[in-house]
């Protein structure tokens, strides 16, 4: 059976000052911010997991002079270690994370302060043999039997589903000059097993904000 060998949680904190790139206009007012984590390397050694990646922070703002909307992206390096007693280099790690308390404050028109907390949840599973009693020879011991349906692990893996599609703008929409902001959210997911495969069906809701040609 598959059981948890070890699990742990760790937090990475960010408190960084970020200079606005020279090609971007001065910031007049912050509108919205978001962030995600990109993992570049997850390496297991004896008793610990080493994580390397980046925190990608996106910002939408109004320019100080023109009053137009602009966007910029900041990449903050991430280097974290999670202690997991008993794990080895060949073990498989299931890693999840959650971004908490993301805040972006303007120091002045050319500098921002970015704060965030990222909580990592790590779980290492292992296959184990479990012995179960099937009978008792002592006549003074009462025995109650019951049929139990057992399931065995057939596949333990992960995969990436890549979606590529073209969207034609409505005729009353201007042509795209610059893409400022986007958000994508999967909806109505339906997973069904097939022969040697897993069928995934659903919708991807996409929101776009862009500047058009004048």
For each feature predicted by the language model, list its residue ranges:
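Viral structural modules
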Residues: 1-214
């Amino acid at each position: 059976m598959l059981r948890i060998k070890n699990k742990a949680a760790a937090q990475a904190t960010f408190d960084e000052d970020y200079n606005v790139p020279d090609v971007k206009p001065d910031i007049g007012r912050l509108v919205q911010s978001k962030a995600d984590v990109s993992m570049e390397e997850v390496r297991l050694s004896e008793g610990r997991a080493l994580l390397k990646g980046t925190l990608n922070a996106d910002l939408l703002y109004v320019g100080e002079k023109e009053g137009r909307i602009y966007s910029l992206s900041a990449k903050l390096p991430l280097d974290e270690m999670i202690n997991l007693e008993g794990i080895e280099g060949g073990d498989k790690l299931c890693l999840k994370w959650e971004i908490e308390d993301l805040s972006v404050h303007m120091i002045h028109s050319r500098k921002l302060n970015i704060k965030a907390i990222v909580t990592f949840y790590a779980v290492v599973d292992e296959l184990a043999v479990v012995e179960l009693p099937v009978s008792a020879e002592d006549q003074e011991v009462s025995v109650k039997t019951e049929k139990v349906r057992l399931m065995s692990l057939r596949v333990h893996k992960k995969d990436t589903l890549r979606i590529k599609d073209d969207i034609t703008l409505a005729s009353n929409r201007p042509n795209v000059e610059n893409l400022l902001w986007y958000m994508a959210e999967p909806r109505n997911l339906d997973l069904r097993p097939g022969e040697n495969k897993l069928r995934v069906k659903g919708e991807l809701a996409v929101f776009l904000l862009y500047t058009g040609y004048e």
